[in-house]
Amino acid sequence: MRSAQVYRWQIPMDAGVVLRDRRLKTREGLYVCLREGEREGWGEISPLPGFSQETWEEAQSVLLAWVNNWLAGDCELPQMPSVAFGVSCALAELADTLPQAANYRAAPLCNGDPDDLILKLADMPGEKVAKVKVGLYEAVRDGMVVNLLLEAIPDLHLRLDANRAWTPLKGQQFAKYVNPDYRHRIAFLEEPCKTRDDSRAFARETGIAIAWDESLREPDFAFVAEKGVRAVVIKPTLTGSLDKVREQVQAAHALGLTAVISSSIESSLGLTQLARIAAWLTPDTIPGLDTLDLMQAQQVRRWPGSPLPLVEVDALERLL
């Protein structure tokens, strides 16, 4: 016997969260809970404004239609990426095919005063990998901050993300302020320039390795080994079903590329599932999941060690 519930939710965000030049005041999304016999499976559907092609309202419409079809015996996955991902997670939990083991290590997202960051990063246990958003300020400032962190902490490796913010000139301005002796400790820089060709040129000219992120979701993208390209950053909420995520990871690994499972600012429920996916598909790579502190609460499932208050399922708005 099948049954299902769909919940709608909103979580207040910290004041400083800006995506694609717009301030994100609340994170909105949906949960689906599927039950069959004694088993149940959960999934999160939370399109990311400015990055997902679908809106929250469009995802809700597609999800409700899919759930009704599933209750009637139809299991075909929807095409909309955020819905396909959430539904496939729920089905995987239901079938016990999503392993429970999780990778809760995080590459901390570095914000704020560089002196405070140096103290925090120097105290990190184990492998020191951190992430810095660049492209939000002047490229020269970004270069100086990155150089300062790498100089102060000799065993630190940085993942940088420019979100295609730079022209070739700005990319060169950034690189000018990063000591060539430190550049090998930039694990990768995600999508430095507005076009892939400019990003490739940046890698050739600076010796700084790059990673593809937005490019993975463009229709003309193909997985190929290229000089200067070290990694792909896979955001499952923007990608689609678990099968599609696994196919992309396998394609990257076959070329010797690092595949990083990364957050689209999901709630704690979605983040714990991403941690399980990372442990399953990319066990040797620290995932990019350090986004929970951008929110003011957890929901349904806790992220280990987080002090944020937990909102229980009974407090959510039920749609079905």
Curated annotation (Swiss-Prot):
One of its GO terms (molecular function) is magnesium ion binding. Its cofactor is a divalent metal cation. The keyword Flavoprotein does not apply. The keyword Lyase applies. Its EC number is 4.2.1.113. It holds the Pfam family MenC_N. Keywords: Lyase, Magnesium, Menaquinone biosynthesis, Metal-binding. It catalyses: (1R,6R)-6-hydroxy-2-succinyl-cyclohexa-2,4-diene-1-carboxylate = 2-succinylbenzoate + H2O. It comes from the Bacteria. Pathway: Quinol/quinone metabolism; 1,4-dihydroxy-2-naphthoate biosynthesis; 1,4-dihydroxy-2-naphthoate from chorismate: step 4/7; Quinol/quinone metabolism; menaquinone biosynthesis. The active site is at 133 (proton donor), 235 (proton acceptor). Mg(2+) binds at residues 161, 190, 213. GO terms for biological process: menaquinone biosynthetic process. Converts 2-succinyl-6-hydroxy-2,4-cyclohexadiene-1-carboxylate (SHCHC) to 2-succinylbenzoate (OSB). PANTHER family: O-SUCCINYLBENZOATE SYNTHASE, O-SUCCINYLBENZOATE SYNTHASE-RELATED. Belongs to the mandelate racemase/muconate lactonizing enzyme family. MenC type 1 subfamily. HAMAP family: MenC_1 (MF_00470). This is o-succinylbenzoate synthase. The gene is menC.
